A protein has these predicted regions:
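N-terminal, polar/Ser/Thr-rich
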Residues: 1-39, 117-126, 138, 142, ...
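Intrinsic-disorder/low-complexity, polar/charged segments enriched in Ser/Thr/Lys/Arg/Asp/Glu/Gln
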Residues: 26-28, 37-43, 56, 84, ...
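Surface-exposed beta-strand/loop patches in extracellular or lumenal glycoproteins
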Residues: 41, 45-63, 137-140, 146-155, ...
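A surface-exposed beta-strand-loop module
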Residues: 49-119, 176-177, 532
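Aromatic/His-enriched, Gly/Pro-containing loop or helix-boundary segments
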Residues: 56, 73-93, 126-135, 223, ...
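Beta-strand-rich binding/interaction modules
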Residues: 65-71, 445-450, 461-532
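Extended, low-hydrophobicity, Ser/Thr/Pro/Gly-biased non-transmembrane segments
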Residues: 102-205
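Hydrophobic alpha-helical and helix-loop surface patches within well-folded domains
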Residues: 183, 214-469, 479
Length: 532
């Protein structure tokens, strides 16, 4: 290989984060869908960020054909810097202004399946992490959150179903055998949560009433011929909606919630606001062919993507280094959901054992190898490689540590504060930790928060060594704990972790003994943390 043909690899560092120089308050998109040439009209309400020095507006793009750029309805000068569209002659001050961009793209040639693509007669999108820039020019970063309106136009016979995020405002026919559908998402979201689906699809529908008395429409869309395999998926979606409302007080916030299942989706599942897109593996099942594992996978993944509605969508990540903020928290929530759905204590235990077995098999080996990285990494070269067992599964165990330290009620108080304080914002793992501590100010977590947050910054699997001794004369038991953590790439010396430990003593007859701690507290379960 000729070394001159190698593209230099750039590294993005967490410490280099800077807030955007502009905010995009609202987005109005119009699509004229065509497999060979889709036309996209992008109207944005933009304003400068007063906290950042004045600079040009630099919009991300990739593989687009640019036709027109207007600012406040007038033509304007622009330049291209690589794939980026740069606008310099913009209104000054803090008043919002309108930017209108007209582009075209070729969905049928999009073999990367990022952005808008065409497969077997249908249009689909995949925008996380940086796919939206392949649809139109935009600030393709998670901390830019906007409200969205989307107008879809297409041939009615070939694409009778037109879906996007949020609530359906209106639909109707157009000349020449075309039709349209207009959608509105009133809740601010980043562009990675945008979704569009168009094609020949059929739906299983179910109307539900929330605890608050609001009616919602649940829909599971599939290709014709697969509708009879969607019954369990609909049951799982209904159970997810009911569970999140009962367990965490988090209700469905849109008039409808849609799932689209297609074999042409290579991301497993994606939590686009109100319009989840799944691979058929996690939706379709029939008793005659599906295994218990298939059913569990459907229930778990549908729960996971639905739970993102609040932990990931309504509150999202400031930057991609905070990915575990949404994924670790939501994996924890889907694990709790699966345990609650299991019913009996023994079935719950089986679920937990399965989770830990998977953690030991996949994440422990990742932590022990050359690719070891913290739950909140410090740098990356390719964002698509960021979706790891450490970020997801270990991240979920870090969230479980909060619940262990605070108890179920204390954790709920922390999550309630997190939702109320940060709804509609793009935040960090530190923000989540602070909410947990602020909601439980007298807790061990609050008193040692900086130590606890080492779980986010240090890689590796710590080892806990325990030794105990019983003094019959004084009827006292002493438990000594030591911890260690092996070196990992870039981290040779590890500071102690905050590790909650559940313990208890049993009498000869197997009954639990009360523990009289030296500090005077009497508890059935004690926590001890020490470093050595």
């Amino acid at each position: 290989m000729n070394s001159k043909s190698i593209t230099p690899v750039s590294t993005t560092h967490r410490e280099d984060y800077c807030p955007p120089a502009f905010w995009i308050d609202s987005v109005d998109l119009t699509f004229d869908l065509d497999a060979a040439k889709t036309r996209v009209l992008n109207k944005m309400r933009v304003r400068r960020n007063p906290a950042v020095a004045a600079q040009a507006l630099r919009l991300d793009g990739d593989g687009l054909t640019l036709a027109r750029v207007l600012v406040n309805g007038q033509g304007t000068s622009f330049k291209m810097d690589g794939n980026a569209l740069v606008l310099e002659n913009l209104p000054e001050g803090e008043q919002p202004f309108d930017v209108e961009i007209f582009t075209t793209c070729a969905p049928e040639k999009n073999t990367r399946l990022e952005g808008l693509y065409y497969s077997e007669g249908c249009f689909f999108t995949q925008c996380e992490a940086e796919g939206f820039r392949r649809i139109t020019y935009f600030l393709d970063r998670p901390d830019v959150m906007s409200t969205w309106r989307v107008l879809l136009r297409a041939d009615k016979q070939r694409y009778p179903v037109l879906l996007s995020n949020g609530n359906l405002l209106e639909q109707g026919d157009l000349p020449d055998g075309r039709h349209y559908a207009q959608w509105s998402d009133p809740f601010r979201k980043p562009c990675y949560l945008f979704a569009l689906v168009a094609g020949l699809l059929v739906a299983r529908e179910q109307r539900i009433t929330s605890r608050a008395g609001k009616e919602h429409l649940l829909q599971v869309y599939v290709r014709p011929g697969d509708l009879d395999k969607t019954g369990y998926a609909m049951q799982s979606l209904q159970a997810s909606v009911a569970w999140d409302e009962a367990r965490f007080g988090l209700s469905l916030d849109l008039e409808r919630f849609m799932i689209v299942a297609t074999s042409d989706f290579n991301m497993g599942a994606m939590e686009n606001k109100g319009l989840n897109i799944f691979n058929t593996k996690y939706v379709l099942a029939k008793p005659s062919t599906a295994t218990d594992g298939d059913y569990h996978g459907i229930e778990s993944v549908i729960g996971h993507e639905y739970f993102h509605n609040w932990t990931g969508n309504r509150i999202t990540c400031r930057d991609w280094f905070q990915l575990s903020l949404k994924e670790g928290l939501t994996v924890f929530r889907d694990q709790e959901f699966s345990q609650d759905m299991a019913g009996s204590a023994s079935a719950r235990a089986v679920c937990r054992i399965a989770n830990v077995r998977g953690l030991r098999q996949h994440q422990f080996s990742e932590d022990a190898g050359p690719m070891a990285h913290p739950v909140r990494p410090e740098q990356y070269q390719e964002i698509s490689n960021f979706y790891t067992s450490t970020v997801y599964e270990k991240g979920a165990e870090v969230v479980r540590l909060y619940q262990t330290l605070l108890g179920r009620d204390g954790f709920r108080q922390g999550l309630d504060l997190y939702i109320s304080r940060h709804d509609g914002q793009a935040v960090t793992c530190d923000d989540f930790a602070q909410c947990m501590a602020d909601a439980n100010p007298a807790s061990t977590l609050a008193q040692h928060l900086d130590i606890f947050k080492r779980w986010y910054s240090q890689a590796g699997t710590p080892q806990l060594h325990a030794s105990g001794s019983y003094d019959a004369a004084t009827r006292s038991y002493t438990l000594t704990l030591r911890q260690s953590c092996p070196a990992t790439p870039g981290q040779t010396d590890k500071a102690p972790f905050l590790i909650p430990v559940r313990m208890g003593l049993l009498a000869a007859n197997g009954q639990a003994l009360p523990l009289h701690l030296k500090n005077g507290d009497v508890q059935g379960v004690a926590s001890n943390n020490s470093a050595g």
